[in-house]
């Protein structure tokens, strides 16, 4: 398989969760004898990998939602999530990745109607629906 073909089948990273879930589901229709995954392992059945990835996204969403107390700001919610998950880093890169993932997951929860976003004098606050 050439570079052009590989690029066509490249999976998205956690940037837009609803789209990522749709793309993962669409991969079920591929009929290849084997698949090379991101970490250079190969599998012959893609279904279990797709199921595990979808389950992991939903699990992260549930864990993030469990940390939300109505009226929290994004910073408060992220802080509560990091405490719950035991994320104790001072590395700027890891912090930025955690913040990015939080923004995508919290945005997905808002889009899915599980969380409401309220704006009050330039401060955004979240609450469970």
Regions found by a protein language model. Name each.
Residues 1-61:
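Metallo-beta-lactamase
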Residues 63-129:
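C-terminal regulatory/interaction regions
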């Amino acid at each position: 398989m050439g570079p052009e073909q590989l690029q066509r089948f490249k999976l998205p990273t956690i940037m837009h969760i609803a789209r990522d879930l749709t793309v993962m589901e669409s991969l079920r229709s591929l009929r290849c004898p084997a698949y090379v995954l991101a970490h250079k392992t190969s599998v012959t059945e893609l279904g279990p990998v797709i199921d595990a990835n979808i389950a992991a996204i939903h699990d992260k969403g549930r864990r993030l939602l469990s940390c939300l107390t109505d009226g929290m700001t994004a910073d408060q919610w992220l802080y509560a999530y990091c405490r719950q998950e035991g994320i104790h880093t001072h590395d700027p890169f890891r912090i930025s990745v955690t913040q990015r993932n939080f923004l995508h997951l919290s945005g997905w929860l808002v889009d899915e109607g599980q969380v409401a976003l309220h704006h009050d004098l330039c401060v955004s606050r979240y609450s469970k629906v």
